[in-house]
Amino acid sequence: MSKKIGILTSGGDCAGLNTVIRAVTLRAVNKYNWQVYGIKDGTLGLMTNPLNIVELKPKDFDGHLMRMGGTFLGSNNKGNPFNSDISDQIIDGFKKTKLDALIGIGGDGSMKILQALTKKGGINFVGIPKTIDNDVKENELSIGYDTAVDTATNALDMLQPTAASHRRAMILEVMGRDAGHIALNAGIAGGADVILIPEIPYSLKSISRHIDRKSVV
């Protein structure tokens, strides 16, 4: 039996989103003969009148699109979907689409939102973890994390010549919020002298002493 599934991206953008959308579309259409619909701008696409959705075909994904960062469907992290009025609009919009299931690509916040909508509105929901923070539980690697670590490592590599030339201590701050995965792994790969992550308490005095010892050497 043919199925209709929807796919959306929610929250911040990252590398790899268009590739995931392509993989879902190719598998669903070519193997199962299902219809795939992209929902524009995250859950906002289910709140507009008319609904902001578009059918996706394998031919839509050319080489140029695959080289683009971000998500061609658009995304958003505005508003509060836990608000009853907003969640009701999203659920009503989903029902109007007559989709059999919804695939949501998002981070920990997006997963919580879509899970709540599932419980409230009976939406068949499949989550694909996407976050450079790599902080989605029960998941080893999230979409976007590897590229974030690689980018931060390259930044460290570029900082080191300037730091050495001017005898300066350089600080590179990376994203991650309450998760130190990017800082830890980029710091190791880039040869950082000190790595600070939110999971482990640290003392500024001990860090200062360590830097002083390094500067003497």
Give the positions of each predicted feature.
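Short glycine/serine/threonine-rich phosphate/pyrophosphate-binding segments
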Residues: 13-24, 46-47, 82-88, 102-115, ...
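N-terminal phosphate-binding or glycine-rich loops at protein starts, especially the Walker A/P-loop
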Residues: 2-50
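Glycine-rich oxoanion-binding loops at beta->alpha junctions
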Residues: 46-104, 109-110, 143-154
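Short glycine-rich or small-residue beta-strand-to-loop segments that form or flank ligand, phosphate
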Residues: 4-12, 71-76, 100-104, 170-173
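A glycine- and small-aliphatic-rich helix-loop capping segment at beta-alpha/alpha-beta transitions
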Residues: 22-30, 52-59, 116-126, 143-147, ...
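Short, ordered loop/turn segments at secondary-structure junctions
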Residues: 10-13, 39-45, 77-78, 107-110, ...
